[in-house]
Amino acid sequence: MLTIADKTFSSRLFTGTGKYANSQVMATSIIASGSELVTMALKRVDIDNRDDDILAPLIKAGVNLLPNTSGAKNAKEAIFAAKLAREALGTNWLKLEIHPDPKYLMPDPIETLAAAAELVRQGFIVLPYCHADPVLCKRLEEVGCAAVMPLGAPIGSNKGLASRDFLEIIIDQARVPVIVDAGIGAPSHAAEAMEMGADAVLVNTAIAAAADPIAMGRAFKLAVESGRMAYEAGLAGTINHAIASSPLTAFLDQTA
């Protein structure tokens, strides 16, 4: 079980809502994945309309909603969007995203830290999307973020854990849950993140853009579960030379 702030989750796979062919495929894929926390961009939904094509199936599925501020270019815009979401959806949970560059969608660390501090002060449960920067993640933790969401690779790139070395440091020093977000393009990437000790992963493009999103949702579910199980079991260490799994000398002595 994973606890973040005031909620406990049995699934460590969080999902997004973008890039699906239609809302029915989205909802069915999310259900197949077992995800209990689903993020959605405020700019893509009519948050005042419970019958919205994206919002309605999520409410019906009974998942926890995590509105995000994707599209915000600075702290002021993100804080404004957060207040709208809280009023319309009745949740103080927020995935904080601030990326002023539309080409690479890199999170702005300065604006993110400033917005996070203010949103926490205003009572939000803040989960910030950020660079895999151990110093920044520690600062976000110190201002009161409920978790940190460092990127594995650029959003939608499917390149996996390009920032692995830094993710390992973040996981080692964090005192709040670490959710690897962005760049996870295959179930094996998700399993790798979980084996490292990440508390959860967030996946969107890899499921939504798959030939069979529903089957891919199930595949990610199993990958996250197996990766976490492997981490808890304790992975065998790596070495630079061979060690026989069966003693060879005893066999030779018996045949002499």
UniProtKB/Swiss-Prot annotation:
CDD domains: ThiG (cd04728). It is found in: Cytoplasm. Its main location: cytoplasm. Its EC number is 2.8.1.10. Belongs to the ThiG family. Homotetramer. Forms heterodimers with either ThiH or ThiS. It catalyses: [ThiS sulfur-carrier protein]-C-terminal-Gly-aminoethanethioate + 2-iminoacetate + 1-deoxy-D-xylulose 5-phosphate = [ThiS sulfur-carrier protein]-C-terminal Gly-Gly + 2-[(2R,5Z)-2-carboxy-4-methylthiazol-5(2H)-ylidene]ethyl phosphate + 2 H2O + H(+). InterPro entries: Aldolase_TIM, Thiazole_synthase_ThiG, ThiG. It comes from Photobacterium profundum (strain SS9). HAMAP family: ThiG. The keyword Protease does not apply. GO terms for cellular component: cytoplasm. Keywords: Cytoplasm, Schiff base, Thiamine biosynthesis, Transferase. This is Thiazole synthase. Pfam families: ThiG (PF05690). One of its GO terms (molecular function) is thiazole synthase activity. One of its GO terms (biological process) is thiamine diphosphate biosynthetic process. Pathway: Cofactor biosynthesis; thiamine diphosphate biosynthesis. Catalyzes the rearrangement of 1-deoxy-D-xylulose 5-phosphate (DXP) to produce the thiazole phosphate moiety of thiamine. Sulfur is provided by the thiocarboxylate moiety of the carrier protein ThiS. In vitro, sulfur can be provided by H(2)S. The active site is at K95. 1-deoxy-D-xylulose 5-phosphate binds at G156, A182, G183, N204, T205.
